[in-house]
Swiss-Prot record:
Belongs to the GcvP family. Pfam families: GcvP2_C (PF21478), GDC-P (PF02347). This is Glycine dehydrogenase (decarboxylating). It is an enzyme of class 1 (oxidoreductase). The lineage of its organism: Bacteria, Pseudomonadati, Pseudomonadota, Alphaproteobacteria, Hyphomicrobiales. SUPFAM superfamilies: PLP-dependent transferases (SSF53383). Its cofactor is pyridoxal 5'-phosphate. InterPro entries: GcvP, GDC-P_C, GDC-P_N, GDC_P, PyrdxlP-dep_Trfase, PyrdxlP-dep_Trfase_major, PyrdxlP-dep_Trfase_small. GO terms for molecular function: glycine binding; glycine dehydrogenase (decarboxylating) activity; pyridoxal phosphate binding. CDD domains: GDC-P. One of its GO terms (cellular component) is cytosol.
Length: 961
């Protein structure tokens, strides 16, 4: 039990003091700088009085770090880690410890942001490029993305891609009945609001007569069946449909690739490549497509371009496809994906190489074949003659006794109708196979059965094409070399372990080591998501408490932890609204009002939920134009479903009229969706569920300390008021009744019941350590830090939006647009020049084109804030030199930025400023300078000359001839 302490002691001596950057003395100095007598007075000038919560958060006392770690060890011990042979897309793995220590547990990798500034992201971009190369080679297709959320959502994205790409009148999609049930559930959820029909059947007998725009085939099947899909694909193509194969990535080292089989799209999960099951995630989903479909591919794509020196450099390619550009017309609402997990999977492939992966696959297949031979000897019939790692066994009325004996052996099996399924993996040993035989009633010896084993791969489906011939998959076989390769890549990146990342709307706060440590505990890492619930008591205690805490913090009545990104949380929340109206006989309510300043995921999610987006204007202060909102709500009153509003606004201000906005929408029968992206400005001060919102998603990877991982993982749980609770996401593989007592009967939005469950431990520990008072203080300091930055920068770069009392919320927008006219300097020039000062740029051109949005969070010290502000002010002085004619903009340090060590080492320097000004501006420290590895990257060249995977080694050989 924790030692009882007062709230003042907790803040002064506890973890909160470590999490919050400024010291009490610095806070006092910063308050003087912004002209506020106290934090409470500043909050009174920042937040509308009408939304302030009256009671403190009831979260219990904060724990010390040792107490929290001991508590997490107790929870992990309550989870029973059985040998799970359930399969169904989740398998035991062995992550190489060199990868675990140097990537998964390394803040240089997990604290980075999405690589929108590619010059300072070359390390993880190269790792993602390797991931894409691996996926393209194994699937036999031309272009892959840099990860999706999981296999289920990847399947739904593939279905949507097929519908967009095939202009057929039919709105039906065929799904192989041997598809994983969670994948089918996600497909049905995605299809229903869009009016698409899901046809489930046997592709051998049913696909040829179906009129569909596409079909999904599981390869191998969920039951383990291994069938040649070529005749089915040919029949589908003959009728104008696209073929999607959901593939087992490890099996593809032995089996013919989807591309060779004629598939147009391949999807799946890279979990088998060394990533623990984690009770459902996070894992990197993947998608690969034929070249003709590349511009419809959802998610982020890493491409190769050149920098200002003509050297190869990586960047995000084809970004105009993405939701922040195309909004409701985007290919997808996908934003955060699973970058850290894709990096882990790519390094697993680098570690083992193609020969090692094939050897693992052959070993698994051999053990599965031996297992099947033993079961046949015991008198059981296996359903499939051809298989890779999974067999389905007819057991009839013996099922219960076999399950009981298997539990005695600490083994979980997949339970079917008179059948049992068994899926083996790289952790399966001969002793486990013998234990399975004992569960089936026989004491057999592996050594005696093995000689009778026969290859059970389909004879016409064996892989003949080479894969992963590129050098990167062959160079780093010793741990020494791999360790240095990973270090080399991480040194190329700028993450939170090196400097503040002031990205607006991203909340790049501290991801504390203590919060991260439980992630690696076996009790959390190695549970199968469909293991019996009695084996996951620790997880369920954590889920119940976390849901209760999040409901307390937000003022909602019920919470779902299933959505595994903020965008998926938006989608799930809108589906809950849709389900509510359907239950009331009002399915026609489909109008969604969205302010023009909204993040692009809002309209993209609304479109996915089958809603029609109507844009609401903003006024000159950046607030929602209440008169325009009222007029549009009245116009669409009979069909109004919701308003989606971000609060504080994306303009960095608490709008005074938020209660009026909620009242207007409610008066016309609509619901209020309050985007939780900016919840870090409200925790402990205001609760959305109390001032009028009906539903919000909660970005745990922002407000509640899950690291961004370079672009994922994230988690986007949703909180709802009681009337929407019955429509929270459900799942076909579990009971979804939460601690709130509501049964969650909505559609499935993620492959696993609790999304990326293992990273929920991070937010849980964060709240444990902070307590209610610590969380409130963090919010107050986040707002103070933003106002401090705004006050320092306003004389140099005008702050675009403030409230009536001159305050910003937790972020501010500075406006350099006038400087483009006076000097020719662009916002991109400023962003790249900040790299020379050792900083990641703020958010560029969102929500206002040509501006910078800055969010310092509560975790940055006054010294780091001053260093950033000094850099911005120094850049303004450099711009003044251009304005006065000292430099032409084309020959200025801003246009040549970022400067690299190659610039410093040039024999001849022909620029009108010195090397010192270029490389060490305004006296920046020389002893620990971050050196950008490449010059400014040519985005246009990269999109015109799209290269998204490494060429095979044969191409190098041909080029050398």
């Amino acid at each position: 039990m924790p030692v009882s302490r007062s709230p003042i002691e907790d803040l002064a001596n506890g973890f909160a003091r470590r999490h919050i950057g400024p010291s009490p003395q610095e806070i006092a100095a910063m308050l003087r700088a912004v002209g506020a007598p106290s934090l409470d007075a500043l909050m009174g000038e920042t937040l509308p009085a009408a939304i302030r919560q009256a009671k403190p958060l009831d979260l219990g006392p904060a724990l010390s770090e040792p107490e929290a770690l001991a508590h997490m060890a107790e929870l992990a011990a309550k989870n029973q880690v059985f040998t799970s042979l359930i399969g169904q897309g989740y398998y035991g793995t062995a992550m190489p410890t060199v990868i675990q220590r140097n990537i998964l547990e390394n803040p240089a990798w997990y604290t980075a942001y999405t690589p929108y500034q590619p010059e300072i992201s070359q390390g993880r971009l190269e790792a993602l490029f390797n991931f894409q190369t691996m996926i393209c080679d194994l699937t036999g297709l031309d272009v892959a993305n840099a990860s999706l959320l999981d296999e289920g959502t990847a399947a739904a994205e593939a279905m949507a891609l097929a519908e967009r790409a095939m202009p057929k009148k039919t709105k039906a999609f065929f799904v192989d009945r041997d598809t994983h049930p969670q994948t089918l559930a996600v497909l049905r959820t995605r299809a229903e609001p869009l009016g698409w029909q899901i046809i489930v059947g046997d592709p051998v007998s049913d696909l040829q007569k179906a009129d569909v725009f596409g079909a999904l085939l599981q390869y191998p099947g969920s039951s383990g069946a291994l069938r040649d899909p070529r005749p089915m694909i040919a029949a589908l193509h003959a009728k104008g449909g696209l073929a999607v194969i959901a593939a087992d990535l490890l099996a593809l080292t032995l089996l013919a690739s989807p591309g060779d089989l004629g598939a147009d799209i391949a999807i799946g999960s890279a979990q088998r490549f060394g990533v623990p099951m984690g009770y459902g995630g996070p894992h990197a989903g993947f998608m690969a497509v034929r070249d003709s479909l590349k511009r419809a591919l959802p998610g982020r794509i890493v491409g190769q371009s050149i920098d200002s020196h003509g050297q190869p450099a990586y960047r995000l390619a084809l970004q105009t496809r993405e939701q922040h550009i195309r909004r409701e017309k985007a290919t997808s609402n996908i934003c955060t994906a699973q970058v850290l997990l894709a990096v882990l999977a790519s390094m697993y492939a680098v570690y083992h190489g193609p020969e090692g992966l094939s050897a693992i696959a052959r070993s698994i297949h051999r053990k599965t074949a031996v297992l099947a031979a033993g079961l046949r000897k015991l008198g059981f019939t296996t359903r499939n003659e051809a298989f890779f790692d999974t067999i389905t066994v007819d057991v009839g009325d013996k099922q219960s006794e076999i399950i009981a004996r298997a539990r005695d052996e600490n083994i979980n099996l997949r339970i079917g109708d008179g059948t049992l399924g068994l899926s083996l993996d790289e952790t399966t040993t001969p002793k486990i196979v013998e234990a399975v035989w004992r569960a089936f009633g026989g004491a057999l010896s592996y050594a005696e059965i093995e000689p009778a084993m026969r290859d059970a791969l389909h004879p016409t489906l064996k892989r003949t094409s080479p894969f992963m011939t590129q050098e990167v998959f062959h160079l780093y076989r010793s741990e020494t070399e791999l360790l240095r390769y990973m270090r080399k890549l991480s040194d190329r990146d700028l993450a939170l372990d090196r400097a503040m990342i002031p990205l607006g709307s991203c909340t790049m706060k501290l991801n504390a080591t203590t919060e991260m440590m439980p992630l690696s505990l076996p009790g959390f890492a190695h549970l199968h998501p469909f293991a019996p619930p009695e084996q996951a008591l620790g997880y369920h205690a954590l889920f119940d408490k976390l849901e209760t805490w999040l409901a307390e913090i937000t003022g909602y009545d019920a919470v779902s932890l299933q959505p595994n990104s903020g965008a998926q949380g938006e989608y799930a929340g809108l589906l809950a609204i849709r389900g509510y109206y359907k239950s009331r006989g009002e399915p026609h309510r489909k109008i969604c009002l969205i302010p023009s300043s909204a993040h692009g995921t809002n309209p993209a999610s609304a479109a996915m939920a089958g809603m029609e987006v109507v844009v609401v204007e903003c006024n000159d202060r950046g607030d929602v134009d209440v008169d325009d909102l009222r007029a549009r709500a009245e116009l669409h009153s009979p069909n109004l479903a919701a308003v989606m509003i971000t609060y504080p606004s994306t303009h960095g201000v608490f709008e005074e009229h938020i209660r009026d906005i909620c009242d207007i929408v409610h008066a016309h029968g609509g619901q209020v969706y309050l985007d939780g992206a900016n919840l870090n400005a409200q925790v402990g001060l205001a609760r959305p569920g109390e001032y009028g919102a009906d539903v919000s998603h909660i970005n745990l990877h922002k407000t509640f300390a899950i690291p961004h991982g370079g672009g994922g993982p994230g988690m986007g749980p949703i909180g709802v008021k009681a009337h929407l609770a019955p429509f929270l996401p459900g799942h076909p593989c579990c009971d979804d009744t939460g601690p709130d007592g509501f049964s969650h009967g909505g559609g499935t939005v993620a492959a696993a019941p609790w999304g990326s469950a293992s990273v929920l431990t991070i937010s849980y520990v964060y709240i444990l350590l902070m307590g209610g008072d610590g969380l409130k203080r963090a919010t107050e300091v986040a707002i103070l830090n933003a106002n401090y930055v705004a006050a320092k920068l306003d004389p140099h770069f005008p702050v675009l939006y403030k409230n009536e009392r001159g305050r910003v919320a937790h972020e501010c927008i500075v406006d350099p647009r006038a400087l483009k006219n006076s000097s020719g300097v662009t916002v991109d020039d400023i962003a790249k020049r900040l790299i020379d000062y050792g900083f990641h740029a703020p958010t560029m051109s969102f929500p206002v084109v040509g501006t910078l949005m800055i969010e310092p969070t509560e975790s940055e010290s006054k010294a780091e804030l001053d260093r950033f502000c000094d850099a911005m002010i120094a850049i303004r002085r450099e711009i003044a030199e251009i304005e006065t004619g000292r430099w032409k903009v084309e020959q200025s340090p801003l246009r040549f930025a970022p400067h690299t060590v190659h610039d410093l080492a040039e024999d001849h320097w022909h620029r009108p400023y010195s090397r010192a000004i270029g490389c060490f501006p305004a006296g920046t420290a020389r002893h620990d300078k971050y050196w950008c590895p490449v010059g400014r990257i040519d985005n246009v060249y990269g999109d015109r000359n799209l290269v998204c995977s490494c060429p095979p080694i044969e191409d190098y050989a041909l080029a050398a001839e």
